[in-house]
């Protein structure tokens, strides 16, 4: 969609995350019976993915599943959870560490109803941020249950961006891209941090310095 093609060769097995049990290993890191998790490394894109009964994968792509969580629980997070965690901590902690404690209070999350967005809303809320959730779906109660303080329609941001607008946010997690990201950049306060991780709307970013 929108020119952002990930899979280039077919036939192909998708599935960017998987969790399971090792049945055969040529690696010293893992042995038969080990429970593992795979996330990232472009598995499901340039390598065959996890939508299969068995998967052959580079051992460097794997980690042992921590005790205390099930494979199902691990996959509830997966790539979406890992991405959300990285974005949330980057948005909040980078500013507070690099700028000697300058706090991140007001944050906007786009695509807030999606996998990455919903987890980012939860994390940022737990970190004490005032979270604005931008979404195309009529699910205000759901987003508020995750910790969102304010809900806006994504359409309010999906338009040609002005060169500069009113500073509203100390930080942002954008999962959408395109005009929405361009508009967010104009609304970020001085020294703000934006973590952009998606291009569902567009791979083009029309902005200005």
Residue ranges and their predicted role:
Residues 2-43:
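Glycine-rich beta-strand-centered segment in the early N-terminal region that forms part
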Residues 44-59:
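A structural motif shared across PLP-dependent enzymes of the aminotransferase-like
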Residues 157-167:
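Short amphipathic alpha-helix with an adjacent loop that forms part of the alpha/beta core around
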Residues 179-209:
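Glycine-rich phosphate-binding loop and adjacent beta-alpha segment
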Residues 34-36, 54, 126, 130, ...:
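Residue-level marker of beta-strand positions
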Residues 75-156:
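Mid-domain Rossmann-like dinucleotide-binding core that forms the NAD(H)/NADP(H) cofactor-binding site
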Residues 19, 37-38, 56, 108, ...:
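Hydrophobic beta-strand signal
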């Amino acid at each position: 969609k929108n020119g952002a093609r990930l899979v280039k060769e077919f036939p192909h097995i998708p599935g960017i995350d998987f969790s399971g049990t090792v049945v055969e290993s040529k690696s010293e890191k893992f042995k038969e019976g080990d429970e593992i998790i795979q996330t990232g490394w472009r598995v499901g894109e340039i390598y065959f993915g996890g939508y299969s009964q068995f998967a052959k994968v580079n051992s460097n792509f794997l980690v042992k599943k921590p005790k205390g969580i099930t494979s199902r629980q691990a996959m509830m997070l997966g790539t979406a959870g890992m991405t959300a965690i990285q974005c949330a901590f980057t948005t909040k902690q980078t500013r507070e560490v690099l700028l000697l404690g300058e706090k991140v209070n007001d944050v906007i999350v786009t695509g807030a109803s999606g996998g990455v967005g919903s987890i980012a809303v939860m994390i940022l809320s737990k970190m004490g941020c005032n979270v604005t959730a931008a979404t195309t779906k009529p699910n205000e109660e759901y987003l508020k249950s995750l910790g969102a303080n304010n809900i806006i329609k994504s359409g309010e941001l999906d338009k040609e961006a002005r060169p500069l607008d009113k500073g509203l946010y100390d930080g942002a997690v954008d999962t959408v891209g395109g005009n929405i990201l361009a508009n967010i950049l104009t609304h970020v306060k001085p020294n703000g941090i934006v973590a952009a991780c998606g291009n569902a709307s567009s791979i083009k970013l029309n902005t200005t310095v």
